[in-house]
Design a protein with these regions (language model features):
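Short acidic/glycine-rich loops and adjacent helix/strand connectors
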Residues: 1-119
Length: 119
């Protein structure tokens, strides 16, 4: 089974695609950068909203896969910045509904390979 995962906990919006055997098909990221200081949550959210579609498209393209090839969607629940996490949740939910596949939450100590092996 092939899993598409979304990471959006803070300054980076990322999309990774893996299978249950441990093969990585793609890992595409786009990072929010500030000129001064740390992360501004509302600005990071805007960045993620602007980057999300291209990041997912690029990951699928790099993996030479179509969205319909995906059997499971996952996303990071946290810890992280709530505005950023919500962008990832919404994108993951949108994709899951579009192709009618399960949506799972990833927590920091989950082993995704074990999870998709049992789906």
């Amino acid at each position: 089974m092939i899993c598409l995962g979304i990471e959006s906990t803070a300054h980076t919006f990322g999309c990774g695609i893996i299978d249950s055997k441990g093969k990585t098909y793609a890992n595409v990221t786009d990072a929010y950068k500030t000129e001064h200081g740390g992360i501004h949550p509302s600005e990071a959210k805007k960045h993620h909203e602007n980057a999300k579609d291209k990041v997912v498209e690029d990951a699928l393209k790099n993996a030479n896969l179509k969205l319909e090839d995906i059997g499971l969607i996952s996303f990071s629940q946290g810890p992280g910045l709530a505005p950023c996490l919500l962008v990832g949740l919404k994108k993951a939910t949108e994709l899951s509904k579009k192709i009618n596949v399960p949506l799972i939450i990833l927590l920091p100590d989950y082993n995704i390979y074990e999870l998709i092996e049992h789906c």
